């Protein structure tokens, strides 16, 4: 399947979303190629519970891209990335960002390798590993973990990967007062950004946590 096999309204929804997020319309083509590949592999390998490509545009692509204004360059580790979310959309739209996609599930890691090859995405790589087992201490400027755990839980498994002064960018729903209060010593909240995701109802926040 290529992007041409996706219904026209899928492409239109993505283009509207990119415009709402002030992103170049040229990113639609590689994002649709990634989406088409995900739809095809998902039928066999069950990479995501979301099946409808229209819903994938909102819940996977546009939701992932909501954080991109707050991360421009440097090295990013995306922990428990699944099929590459948010790491692959971020790598597409932020070519100066070096993205490591950390995922222990073999079929998801295989999918991501194929996606990177298919997209010729040279600024991303796959690390087939659990985050806590990845032996790359202080190698990253940024961490993100869209689908993992509490803030303290993310720090427990992946905090060693972040350099001093680096930032954890955590996507959350409602403002996570309790999680912020439970941060371990040496970690502080820098900013909390309310996010608007085109087509997605409900609260979304990006919590930026700094490593002391």
UniProtKB/Swiss-Prot annotation:
Enzyme Commission identifier(s): 2.1.1.170
Localization, UniProt: Cytoplasm
InterPro entries per the UniProt record, alphabetical: rRNA_ssu_MeTfrase_G, SAM-dependent_MTases_sf
Main location: cytoplasm
One Gene Ontology term, aspect cellular component: cytosol
GO MF, any single term: rRNA (guanine-N7-)-methyltransferase activity
EC class (word): transferase
Domain of life: Bacteria
Binding site for S-adenosyl-L-methionine: 80, 85, 131-132, 146
Catalyzed reactions: guanosine(527) in 16S rRNA + S-adenosyl-L-methionine = N(7)-methylguanosine(527) in 16S rRNA + S-adenosyl-L-homocysteine
Record-linked Gene3D superfamilies: Vaccinia Virus protein VP39
Keywords: Cytoplasm, Methyltransferase, rRNA processing, S-adenosyl-L-methionine, Transferase
Its biological purpose: Specifically methylates the N7 position of guanine in position 527 of 16S rRNA.
HAMAP family listed in its UniProt record: 16SrRNA_methyltr_G
PANTHER family to which the protein is assigned, alphabetical: S-ADENOSYL-L-METHIONINE-DEPENDENT METHYLTRANSFERASES SUPERFAMILY PROTEIN (PTHR31760:SF0)
Full protein name: Ribosomal RNA small subunit methyltransferase G
Lineage, broadest ranks: Bacteria, Pseudomonadati, Pseudomonadota, Gammaproteobacteria, Lysobacterales
């Amino acid at each position: 399947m290529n992007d041409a096999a996706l219904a026209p309204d899928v492409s239109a929804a993505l283009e509207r979303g990119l415009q709402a997020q002030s992103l170049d319309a040229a990113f639609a083509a590689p994002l649709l190629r990634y989406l088409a590949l995900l739809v095809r592999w998902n039928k066999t390998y069950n990479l995501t519970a979301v099946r409808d490509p229209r819903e994938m545009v909102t819940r996977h692509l546009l939701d992932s891209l909501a954080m991109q204004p707050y991360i421009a360059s440097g090295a990013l580790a995306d922990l428990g990335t699944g099929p590459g979310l948010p790491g692959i959309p971020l790598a597409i739209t932020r070519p100066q960002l070096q993205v490591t996609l950390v995922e222990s599930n073999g079929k998801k890691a295989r999918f991501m390798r194929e996606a990177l090859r298919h997209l010729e995405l040279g600024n991303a790589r796959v690390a087939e590993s659990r985050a806590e087992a990845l032996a790359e201490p202080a190698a990253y400027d940024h961490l993100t973990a869209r689908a993992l755990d509490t803030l303290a839980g993310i720090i427990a498994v992946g905090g060693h990967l972040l350099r001093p002064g680096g930032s954890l960018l955590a996507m959350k729903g409602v403002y996570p007062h309790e999680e912020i209060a439970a941060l371990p010593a040496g970690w502080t909240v820098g900013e909390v950004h309310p996010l608007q995701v085109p087509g997605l109802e409900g609260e979304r926040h990006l919590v930026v946590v700094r490593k002391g």
